[in-house]
């Protein structure tokens, strides 16, 4: 991360839901979020497989929570800098998203298929909450629902600063 020059992350989510108490609420405790940032010196990427997420198929409510320290990097030093210097994970231990899938009633959750959807809501990261909107794919297969989405955020929007000497190197 010391060599990070870009001030944005590309976030990808992949969640596989299974039904809980009633057929309209689906839950996963092992969703996946990854991020990628391209720099001139070195690309930075990490994966977190400990994402908790809930989807209500009757009203389109969707939410997830991720423990920041759960992101794993290829290099230990990157992980250390990410947690201590950039995301300050002791002070801001998790990120959350609370939103809604538009036109959820048009999706037939009893029929296998790929359903492109629009999602919007509030992403809270580093103690800052911002509205985000994007597209996602819902995949229904054998009674299970998988969701995936890719979106970009600007680090500055979430008060995540990169030291000038790192940004300019």
Give residue spans per PLM region.
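Bacterial Sec-dependent N-terminal signal peptides
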Residues: 1-26
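Low-complexity, acidic/polar, glycine-enriched regions of mature
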Residues: 23-169
């Amino acid at each position: 991360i010391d060599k990070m020059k870009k001030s944005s992350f590309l976030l990808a989510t992949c969640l596989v839901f299974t039904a809980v108490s009633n057929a309209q609420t689906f839950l996963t405790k092992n969703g996946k979020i990854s991020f990628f940032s391209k720099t001139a010196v070195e690309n930075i990427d990490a994966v977190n497989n400990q994402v908790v997420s809930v989807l209500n198929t009757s009203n389109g409510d969707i939410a997830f929570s991720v423990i920041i320290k759960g992101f794993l990097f290829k290099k230990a030093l990157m992980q250390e800098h990410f947690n201590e210097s950039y995301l300050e994970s002791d002070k801001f231990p998790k990120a959350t998203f609370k939103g809604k899938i538009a036109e959820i009633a048009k999706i037939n959750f009893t029929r296998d298929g790929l359903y492109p959807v629009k999602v919007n809501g509030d992403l809270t990261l580093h103690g800052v909450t911002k509205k985000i909107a994007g597209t996602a794919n819902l995949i229904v297969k054998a009674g299970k629902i998988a969701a995936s989405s890719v979106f970009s955020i600007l680090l500055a929007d979430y008060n995540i600063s990169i030291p000038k000497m790192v940004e300019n190197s």
